[in-house]
Amino acid sequence: MIVLKATQDKVLAVLQSVAGIVERRHTLPILANVLIRKTGNALQLTTSDLEIQIRTTAELGGDTGDFTTTVGARKLIDILRTMPGDQTVSLESQQSKLVLKGGKSRFTLQSLPAEDFPLVQESAAFGPAFSVPQKTLKDLLGQVSFAMAVQDIRYYLNGILFVAEGKTLSLVATDGHRLAFASATLDVEVPKQEVILPRKTVIELQRLLSDAGGENQPHIEMQFANNQAKFTFGGMEFVTKLVEGKFPDYNRVIPKNHKNSITLGRAPLLASLQRTAIMTSDKFKGVRLNIEPGTLRVASNNAEQEEAVDELDIDYGGDTIEIGFNVTYLIDALANMGQDMVKVELSDGNSSALMTIPDNDSFKYVVMPMRI
């Protein structure tokens, strides 16, 4: 049976949309495979790592009929990448193997039985569905994902908190040193739901989501259950397990009523920090900010007695403050805000700083100071 027959670019795009979660080496060899299910003209591809399952349906030609098998996903992609985009390729079943043909090339691949592929059991208790433009969710993820912890023993920090309540969707991430919050308005009102999405899920969603805008921009539908989240978009169904545990009360972490605030251009501040970061210690990455009426001075030095000083003119008439930060934490936030102006609020040299967008509550970033 000819399972599919289409140009290389079409086949590769469909395979790549589901293959991001596939590991080359796994304790279960079949998890390195993609589950192929042909029903009539429709071809369904499914991958899983036991935590996440991605499924997409496409029409890629071939014979009409019913057929199921599994084959190595990465190997198939590696072969397809070596072929021209406009070349017609076909995948044929021959006994227990699959044969990939393209031009004068022929590849015989081993398959494993479809019935051995471990499908994720979907929850029967998903909450009400709601949707946002894919670009909106991609932007929100970009504004907070850099603050996720990496392999923290506090496992609930290794991901992003999603909070849907009323007509607001909020995303929060923290690694204990900094906290990023971003929110967007929903078209419908939803009951309060809170879930923590794992780090791998977040990274995969960012890869797959479209950033196309405009009137007909594609949407993503979301549903949450106690132990799962489901996302439906672009012909794909994305089901993921959740991180168990209690996320910190982010409202208590976000400081209020700072005595001093500066509003300045995001790009000049980012450029100043990137310049002074060159002279920081590889280990500590610390910069000092000296803030006084009219001037913001950014300084750094390292163990080789080298130093950098950069000054910015600011509209400021508050207290004189000297405070240290991990420069990477500041750069991460400024690089992902996507706005022209930034507001920095401070109380003194020993308290956390709050970065926001002027006259906009949709983004908040809290960063702890650092002794230098």
Model-derived features with residue positions:
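Structural preference for solvent-exposed beta-strand-turn elements
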Residues: 1-372
